[in-house]
Design a protein with these regions (language model features):
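Mature-chain termini and adjacent capping regions
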Residues: 1-186
């Protein structure tokens, strides 16, 4: 078991961050559909990625890494914040610290916040499944916003390979607040 404490800027975790940033928030749901295409987020592979947390614990034998306390992932204008992030990876002899880990799933919990320019998302939980190419934001209330346009539900599922997205309700309707002035800016 390996433990690291703040500050943490781990270049070997670049794949984790790129996947998190790309999958986590690709845009906002269009019009009044609960199923829609999401605009792809533009990330540069040549931009540095920084991860910091109060503590990092790597358990290579279990193929798990735990980032806990004030987790912050930044690449360019995209920022992910959460109370904790758990990374599951696979591959015999692979190691997160050497950069050869094959990421299987990533879980983020405790006040998940994503911000990319004018686009923002908040949730209680997030899950990335690399094999299924899906990302799910869930919780008591998932809020997506772009400028004054706001979409609220309890579960957002994004198919990373197609950009398809579905926002599900909390037992009642999915709520959408659209600002007609935002259409004129685009």
């Amino acid at each position: 078991m390996m433990q690291f404490s703040r500050p943490g800027n781990f270049k070997s975790s670049a794949y984790i961050c790129a996947t998190l940033a790309l999958a986590s928030f690709a845009g906002t749901v269009a019009a009044q559909n609960t199923t829609s295409k999401m605009e792809g987020m533009q990330l540069s592979n040549d931009q540095p990625i920084a991860i910091e947390s109060d503590q990092l614990e790597i358990r290579d034998q279990e193929r798990k890494a735990y980032f806990t306390g004030n987790v912050k992932v930044v690449q360019g204008t995209t920022t992910l914040q959460a109370g904790k992030m758990t990374v599951l990876y696979k591959g015999e002899g692979s190691s997160l610290t050497s950069g050869d880990a094959n990421i299987d799933k990533i879980f983020v919990d405790n006040q998940v916040f994503l911000n990319s320019g004018t686009q923002k998302a908040t949730a209680d939980h997030g899950e990335f499944d690399m094999a299924a190419q899906t990302f799910i934001l869930s919780g008591k209330q998932v809020v997506l916003s772009q400028e004054k346009n706001v979409f609220t539900g309890c579960k957002l599922t994004v198919l990373m390979n197609t950009g398809e997205a579905k926002l599900e309700s909390c037992g009642g309707p999915v709520r959408i607040m659209l600002d007609p002035k935002s259409q004129k800016k685009q």
